C-alpha cells in the first residue's frame, strides 16, 4: 500500500476549510477529512460541500461516534463521506454496529484509538469486527505537553494487519519517522492548514513521506522539556502567551527601556520597599546567566534600580530585569543594552535599608510570580508562566502564533478583512434574552 496523506480540516468556518482543501489537493493531498470542529460548527453540509468540490477524492467524516453508530454512519455516507470514524473508547456494541452500518451503506469505518488505555488490544478488537482501519492519535492537548504517537504506533502496527493511520502534530520533519514506524496514512492538520502556503506545505510533507528524508517546516517543533523553553518563548509574544492562557492578564503599562527586544527566563524574585535598593542589588548575586530578575517595590517612586545595578546584571548574564516600581538612569541603561522593564521612571532613589526579601512569592495586580516561574517580556508587557505548566503554555502560544500567521496570509492574499476571514459576525456570542415573551 502506497503511503497516503490525509488533510485534517479542523476549522470552524467552511469557507476557510474549502480554501485550505483546494491548496492541499493541489499539493498532492490524497484524502480530505472533515475535522470534528468543522463537523460540529457546520454539520454534514461540510461533507456535502467538500464532496461537490472534490467528487473523486476520499472524504473522512470525523464524527468520533460514541453512540447511535448506525444513524451516524448512515448520514455520513449519504452526505458523501467514504470513511466515518468511531472512537475506540465506545462500547463494543457501538463499534460492531458502526461496522455493520458501514457494510450496508458502503462507508469504511475507521476506529480512532484516542485515549484507549491499551491501543494495541483495542486495535485487534476493531480488526476482528470488520473495521477498515485504526487511527493512532496523539491529540493536541497531549502534544502541547510533549506527547507524540510513535510508541503507540509501533505497538498497533505490530498488532494488526489492517491499515493504520496516524495523527498528532506531524510535519515534514517528523513524517519519515511515522512512515518508518508503519503508518499507511499520515494525517496532517496544522502543518498544512496553518501554513502560509498550504500547497507548498503539503508537497513538502509528501516528499518527506515518500523519500524518507525529513524536510523543512515553518511550524515550530513542539518542545517536551524545560531545557528547550527559552528557544520557543523568544519566538512568541506576550499576546500569544495571553491567548494561550485563555486571555490571561499580563503586567502592562511598563516602560521598555530597550524597545524591540523580547526576553525569557526563570524568575528570581525580590520584594522591597519603595526606594530601598539593597535587596534588588543583592539579588543579582543570586542570579544565574539567563535569569530574569523580578522586583516588586509597590509600583511607585523612589527608584530601586539604576545604571550601576544594570552594569552588574549585564556582567552576570541576566536576560533582563522587570521592575514593578521605579527606575532611574534610563539613558545610560539604554546604552548598556540590558532589557529593563519598569512601571515608572524617576531621578531619585532611596536608601539601601534592606527592608525586603529575595526568593519570595510575589502577587501584583492579581498576577502571581513564584521563584522559578518563567517570565517573558516585550514591548507589550510581561507574562508569567507557572513553572509546572510552562512547557504546555509555550507550545500553546506557538500554536496561537501559527494560527495567526495563516489568518494574516488569508487577509493579505484575498483582500478580505479580519471579520470576513474569521466570520466574526457568525461567531458573536448568542445570549439568552431577558425580555418577556409576548
Model-derived features: positions:
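Hydrophobic faces of well-ordered beta-strands that scaffold small-molecule active sites
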Residues: 3-9, 32-34, 59-63, 84-86, ...
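Active-site/ligand-binding-proximal alpha/beta "capping" segment
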Residues: 132-187, 191-193, 363-398
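Alpha-helix-loop-beta-strand connector modules within alpha/beta enzyme cores
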Residues: 43-64, 98-115, 147-170, 204-218, ...
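Conserved N-terminal beta1-alpha1 strand-loop-helix module at the mouth
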Residues: 1-70, 119, 126-129, 235-240, ...
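Short, small-residue-enriched loops and turns at beta-alpha junctions
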Residues: 11-16, 36-42, 65-68, 90-93, ...
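C-terminal helical cap(s) of enzyme catalytic domains, especially alpha/beta-barrels
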Residues: 98, 179-181, 190-218, 397
Amino acid at each position: 500500500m502506497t503511503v497516503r496523506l490525509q488533510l485534517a480540516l479542523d476549522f470552524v468556518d467552511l469557507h476557510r476549510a474549502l480554501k485550505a482543501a483546494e491548496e492541499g489537493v493541489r499539493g498532492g493531498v490524497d484524502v480530505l477529512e472533515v475535522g470534528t470542529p468543522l463537523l460540529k460548527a457546520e454539520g454534514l453540509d461540510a461533507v456535502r460541500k467538500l464532496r461537490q468540490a472534490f467528487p473523486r477524492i476520499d472524504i473522512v467524516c470525523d464524527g468520533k461516534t460514541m453512540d447511535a453508530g448506525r444513524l451516524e454512519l448512515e448520514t455520513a455516507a449519504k452526505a458523501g463521506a467514504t470513511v466515518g470514524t468511531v472512537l475506540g473508547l465506545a462500547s463494543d456494541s457501538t463499534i460492531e454496529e458502526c461496522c455493520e452500518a458501514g457494510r450496508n451503506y458502503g462507508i469504511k469505518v475507521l476506529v480512532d484509538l484516542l485515549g484507549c488505555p491499551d491501543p494495541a488490544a483495542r486495535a485487534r478488537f476493531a480488526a476482528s469486527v470488520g473495521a477498515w482501519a485504526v487511527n493512532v492519535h496523539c491529540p493536541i492537548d497531549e502534544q502541547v505537553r510533549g506527547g507524540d504517537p510513535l510508541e503507540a504506533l509501533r505497538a498497533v502496527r505490530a498488532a494488526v494487519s489492517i491499515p493504520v493511520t496516524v495523527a498528532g502534530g506531524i510535519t515534514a520533519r517528523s513524517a519519515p519517522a511515522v512512515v518508518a514506524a508503519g503508518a499507511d496514512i499520515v494525517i496532517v492538520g496544522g502543518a498544512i492548514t496553518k501554513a502560509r502556503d498550504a500547497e507548498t506545505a503539503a508537497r513538502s510533507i509528501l516528499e518527506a513521506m515518500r523519500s524518507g528524508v525529513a524536510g523543512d517546516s515553518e511550524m515550530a517543533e513542539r518542545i517536551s522539556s524545560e531545557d528547550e523553553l527559552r528557544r520557543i518563548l523568544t519566538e512568541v509574544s506576550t499576546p500569544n502567551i495571553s491567548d494561550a492562557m485563555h486571555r490571561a492578564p499580563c503586567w502592562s503599562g511598563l516602560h521598555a527601556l530597550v524597545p524591540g527586544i523580547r526576553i525569557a527566563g526563570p524568575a528570581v524574585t525580590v520584594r522591597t520597599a519603595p526606594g530601598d535598593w539593597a535587596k534588588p542589588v543583592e539579588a543579582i548575586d543570586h542570579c544565574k546567566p539567563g535569569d530574569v530578575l523580578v522586583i516588586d517595590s509597590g509600583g511607585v517612586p523612589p527608584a530601586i534600580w539604576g545604571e550601576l545595578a544594570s552594569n552588574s546584571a549585564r556582567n552576570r548574564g541576566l536576560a533582563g530585569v522587570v521592575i514593578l516600581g521605579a527606575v532611574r538612569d534610563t539613558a545610560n541603561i539604554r546604552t548598556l543594552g540590558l532589557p529593563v522593564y519598569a512601571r515608572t521612571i524617576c531621578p531619585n532613589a532611596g536608601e539601601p535599608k534592606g527592608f525586603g526579601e529575595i526568593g519570595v512569592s510575589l502577587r501584583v495586580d492579581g498576577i502571581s510570580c513564584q521563584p522559578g516561574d518563567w517570565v517573558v517580556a516585550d514591548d507589550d508587557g510581561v507574562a508569567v508562566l507557572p513553572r509546572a505548566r510552562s512547557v504546555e503554555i509555550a507550545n500553546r502560544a506557538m500554536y496561537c502564533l501559527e494560527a495567526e500567521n495563516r489568518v494574516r496570509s488569508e487577509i493579505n492574499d484575498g483582500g478580505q478583512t479580519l471579520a470576513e476571514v474569521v466570520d466574526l459576525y457568525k461567531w458573536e456570542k448568542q445570549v439568552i434574552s431577558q425580555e418577556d415573551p409576548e
